[in-house]
Amino acid sequence: MVDGAPRAQGEAVKITYVGHATLLLEMAGVRILTDPNFEPKLGRFLARVAAPGVAIDALPALDALLLTHAHADHLSFKSLDRLPRNIPLYAPPAVAQWLVRKGYRHATPIDDGEHVTIGQALRVHTGRATHKGNRYGFDRWRSATNMYLLESNEESAFFAGDTALTPSTHHLVERVLWAQQRQLDIALLPIGYAPAWKPGFRRGHLTGDDALALFKTLRARAMLPYHWGTFRHVTASAHDAIDRLRASLVLHDAREHVHVIEPGESLTLGPEARR
């Protein structure tokens, strides 16, 4: 981990796509890493097709880790083992309790409706996603999945984790930002693809078109898709989801506000993006 790297200050929001659901978020002088996964494959057969956009040893000093749920593509024990244990690790209560029992004593539960302040000015609010996040078939008590809204007095970012599109998916943004008559700066949304013979996919995930619909509902200034281009899938390639999203964007009226970045690339939104 690299100390002394400059931090995003002022009203800038910087997002670096590490891969899959691992994003490095820098805002309000704070650095947060989401769902860290730096493994070369998922399970035995689903190989990683792109190296992490930032090597785990090259990460800057972090202020917090955010875990959304216990699925293996979002909760990587091998990755957690390589990160310092003095970084606060926030997760759904049942997941955090499990992590503590496994020796990750820096894990802290954060539940739907709760929030924590990181640094001097960044507030992280939690909402419940529509996604069964238990790791195994027998641990349904561990199925809760978090989504997170990060906001200071100047900027905001919504990290959806894994979720389906439902009439209430926007509830966290509504409760925190809309109640203050504020607009969301950027929606960080997962995209996926499953063939027609797998209809259950959309009960817990967003397709690219679902993500565009949610982006419209959230009334955010910008959108960044993730959850693509990292691991092979059983029913699709690693790039099917982003290829379909790009096709949908060709004639979409929001295409100039959707930012597709490759692993290792960063997007910075300054104050001018909020005018």
Language model regions located:
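Metallo-beta-lactamase
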Residues: 2-10, 92-155, 244-273
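Catalytic core of the metallo-beta-lactamase
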Residues: 18-27, 117-183, 206, 210
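Structural motif
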Residues: 30-32, 63-64, 88, 122, ...
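Conserved beta-strand hairpin/beta-sheet module of binuclear metal-dependent hydrolase folds
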Residues: 8-54, 64, 141-161
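Pre-active-site segment of Zn-dependent metallo-hydrolases
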Residues: 2, 6, 28-70, 77-82, ...
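Divalent metal-coordination and catalytic microenvironments
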Residues: 25, 35, 69, 76, ...
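Active-site metal-binding loops of divalent metal-dependent hydrolases
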Residues: 36-38, 70, 129-130, 161-163, ...
